[in-house]
Regions:
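C-terminal structural segment of proteins
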Residues: 1-270
Length: 270
């Protein structure tokens, strides 16, 4: 089946084109989309591209930073204001992938990909769509209805400004280092002292990145010591149904999640 490609200079025009194409996909970096096309994915009939510079911008907005959806992992690593996200971007594939893979594309990545989105979820990020005039959608809500948002163009992702890179902790659990697909990823944002206000997110433990709400509640007010995090580790997978796939079983994911969460919270190997 032939694929129609449209290129627009304005993000508003691109958004209209994508919304009117029932078989359309937006082209960001193409690291996953081109694989689907090469595998003859029959659900894709139209590709919409956009060259609007707004997609490549990183700008300050008060106490938050707006990261354009077209910003690549390599650009994240090179941006001083985004130093707290550089370790996460660094584990996304190899140099060739990082030079193409975009923040917006990662939002739609299916397991075993989407590690960067896991970190964004821990950071309480929000998503801004083209034409929303400053309004944004919490990332958690976006992920809950992600399948129905492919017809909209993401303009940027909003994250809090973090001056201490150690406040965001991240681990990618893989059998093939350093570039293997993750069987699990864990991100923890520790904005306060101890576990106060801690946010924990898992990747590849559900169809989309997901919060570890029970572990967060158990950690509230606790110290980041072995004794203080004990209840959080017991609740590490409470309320979750990890998948069984070619990378790991549900049982294995439940067994290793507390181990890696413990190391992350104690800052071991960070």
């Amino acid at each position: 089946m032939p694929v129609h490609v449209e290129t627009h200079a304005n993000i508003s025009d691109a958004a209209r084109a994508l919304s009117s194409a029932r078989d359309g996909r937006f082209f960001g970096g193409g690291t996953l989309l081109m694989r689907a096309l090469n595998e003859a994915d029959q659900s894709i009939g139209t590709i919409v591209r956009c060259t609007d510079p707004v997609l490549r911008q990183v700008r300050s907005e008060g106490d938050r930073i707006a990261i354009g959806a077209g910003v690549t992992m390599a650009e994240i690593m090179a941006n001083r204001d985004l130093a707290f996200l550089a370790p996460v971007a660094r584990i996304i594939g190899g140099p060739a992938v990082r030079s193409a893979a975009t923040v917006g594309g990662n939002l739609f990545a299916e397991p075993p990909y989407g590690d960067f989105t896991t970190a964004l979820l821990a950071l309480d990020a929000s998503v801004r769509f083209a034409g929303e005039s400053g309004q944004s959608t919490p990332l958690q809500d976006f992920l809950r209805d992600r399948a129905n948002r492919r017809g909209r163009v993401v303009e940027s992702v909003m994250v809090p400004r973090i001056t201490d890179p150690k406040a965001l902790r991240f681990v990618k659990v893989t059998r093939v280092k350093p570039k293997g697909a993750a069987l699990m990823s864990i991100a923890a944002w520790l904005p306060g002292s101890g576990g106060r206000g801690c946010r924990i997110a898992y990747g590849n433990m559900a169809p989309t990145p997901v919060r570890a709400a029970a572990a967060e509640r158990a950690l509230e007010g606790a110290s980041l010591s072995e004794q203080g995090i004990a209840r959080a580790l017991q609740a590490a997978t409470e309320g979750l149904t990890p998948p069984t796939d070619m990378f790991a079983s549900e049982w294995y994911r439940r067994e290793v999640a507390p181990v890696h969460l413990k190391r992350l919270l104690l800052g071991q190997g960070q």
